[in-house]
Amino acid sequence: MEKLFIKPDSLLKDSSQLAWNVYESGFEPNYIIGVWRGGAPIGIAVQEFLSFLGIKSDHVAVRTSYYSGIDSRKDSVQVYGLNYVIRQLESEDRLLIVDDVHDTGNSIAQIINDITSACKKNTPDIKVATPYYKPNKSQ
């Protein structure tokens, strides 16, 4: 399969559609995590769109390290930058994790695992949103 390059205007349009889908689902996140790098601009667009619709949220970017190069992975996923969110989250909160592409799901799974391990009984309702996916890689 040939690599697809997405133009900035298409990314913004797709990010707005993703935000609308979240809104229409009835899920109102009060925290949004954008997964650095690709998910950060999408997370910003989703947060701005939802804010315009009256849904206020705190938002941060977190980084994962899993890839050592294109299509080359390390053995485990490391997550960086969750401390602020973990200190803030309560069980009644709603967290939206935004990334650009759903690939294997391993990075998102590790973020969720780290949050649930740290928050224990204070783990919030967590949803994931991505505008794109790799059908041949998803697990």
Indicate where each model-derived feature is located:
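PRPP-associated nucleotide enzymes
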Residues: 1-139
